């Protein structure tokens, strides 16, 4: 397996359908998906797996996603990992203020997700730098 195909993207969500859809997209790209439930210790897993990016589902009054974002961004190691925050609500200002590197409002198309990864990582879904 070459170096590019080993790059991992952690998908942390509370909704299994959210994780399933993003895993499908990631499988068709140069990355490998690491699905994680928000109830799990996302911070420890991020330290262990060292993904190139984390996609984090947050949802309004649910504090789990926001708490996870703050924990990730305050950690000396995991804080360097770029995070895309996804929510059904228009909370982009909050997401960016809390430390997210990008914000996507759901629902979004695969193309929008791919464009966000390209912008965030400086490479397209095939792992080629731009």
Language-model-detected regions and their locations in the chain:
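Alpha4 helix (beta4-alpha4-beta5 surface) of REC/receiver domains from two-component response regulators
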Residues: 63-67, 88-106, 115
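A short, hydrophobic beta-strand element within the central beta-sheet of small alpha/beta folds
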Residues: 79-90
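Conserved phosphotransfer cores of two-component systems
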Residues: 47-49, 72-80, 98, 119
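Conserved phosphotransfer microenvironments
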Residues: 56-74
């Amino acid at each position: 397996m070459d170096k590019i195909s080993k790059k991992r993207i952690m998908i942390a969500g509370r909704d299994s359908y959210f994780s399933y859809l993003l895993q499908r997209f990631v499988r068709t790209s140069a990355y490998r998906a690491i699905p994680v439930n928000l109830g799990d210790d996302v911070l420890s897993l991020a330290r262990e797996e060292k993904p190139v990016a984390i996609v984090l589902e947050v949802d309004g009054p649910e504090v789990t996603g926001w708490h996870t974002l703050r924990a990730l961004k305050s950690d000396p190691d995991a804080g360097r990992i770029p995070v895309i925050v996804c929510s059904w609500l228009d909370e982009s200002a909050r997401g960016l203020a809390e430390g997210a590197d990008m914000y996507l409002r759901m629902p979004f198309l695969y193309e929008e997700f791919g464009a966000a990864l390209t912008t965030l990582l400086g490479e397209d879904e095939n792992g080629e730098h731009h």
